[in-house]
A protein has these predicted regions:
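Flexible, glycine-rich phosphate/dinucleotide-binding loops
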Residues: 39, 71, 138, 161, ...
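Aromatic-lined carbohydrate-recognition surfaces of secreted/lumenal glycan-active proteins
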Residues: 124-139
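Substrate-binding cleft of extracellular glycoside hydrolase catalytic domains
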Residues: 1-128
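A generic local structural motif
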Residues: 17, 138-141
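Noncatalytic linker/hinge segments flanking ATPase motor cores
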Residues: 71-74, 106-107, 136-139, 173-174, ...
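Short beta-strand/turn micro-motifs composed of small residues
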Residues: 66, 133, 156
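Functionally critical loop-and-helix segments that line ligand-binding/catalytic clefts
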Residues: 1-12, 143-207
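Structural recognition of alpha->loop->beta junctions
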Residues: 78-98, 102, 141-168
């Protein structure tokens, strides 16, 4: 596995104070949680704007993700519109991901339809997109063959990624990354795709 970039994830679990000493020498990129939706109530992350401002001020590339438990296409499309409105006038060098948290294994088609709908909306709005989940969620809760065309951000906290049923472009390998001069531990991901190059060449994500 050829690791091109290493980056950390940020959400409201962290704070702007926890990253104030981080520079582009400490990490190659941020993955910033922008919103979450539980039962149709989508809310923006409180620290989202501050994280974006910090990344831009310190020239740290970034992508975003949002979390939802929706398996309804119309609801997911509404959430997508909310997310893409947040991303207006921003230049992101990494994709925008949907993380779906649905425990109902009888709704495989609906869950997959929702991810496809989100990624379709993303493409329409000129965003490079994908989905984020564990290998077991991919295998048991989704029709993974329909998702092969999209960027896959694997969550597997281990020293090896295992054998997920489709290739991944990014792998969150730990939630206990320690960065010098900071008190917090962060989720860290390895990126094996040159997303910044692909995004710029195709004029996506604000480019």
């Amino acid at each position: 596995m050829n690791i091109i970039y290493q980056g950390i994830s940020l959400s409201d679990k962290e704070s702007i104070q926890s990253i104030k000493n981080i520079t582009d020498k400490d990490t190659n990129y941020f993955m910033i949680k922008c919103a979450s939706s539980l039962d149709g109530n989508i809310e923006k992350e409180k620290n989202f704007d501050e994280y974006i401002s910090y990344a831009e001020l310190h020239s740290i590339p970034y992508g975003v993700y949002y979390v939802t438990n929706s398996t309804d296409i119309k609801q997911t499309e509404k959430e997508a519109d909310f997310v893409f409105e947040l991303l207006k006038n921003k230049k992101m060098q990494f994709p925008v991901y949907i993380e779906q948290v649905n425990t109902d294994k009888t709704k495989i088609k609906e869950a997959t339809d929702s991810i496809v709908a989100f990624c379709g909306k993303a493409w329409y709005n000129k965003f490079y997109s994908g989905f984020r989940c564990t290998a077991s969620y991919l295998r048991n809760n989704l029709d993974f063959n329909r998702l092969r065309r999209y960027n896959f951000w694997l969550v597997c906290h281990s020293d090896r990624p295992g054998n997920p049923v489709i290739p991944f472009g990014m792998w969150e390998h730990t939630n206990k990354c320690r960065i010098d001069n900071t008190l917090n531990m962060f989720p860290e991901s390895y990126c094996i795709q040159n997303y910044p190059k692909t995004i710029r060449q195709n004029n996506l994500n604000g480019y």
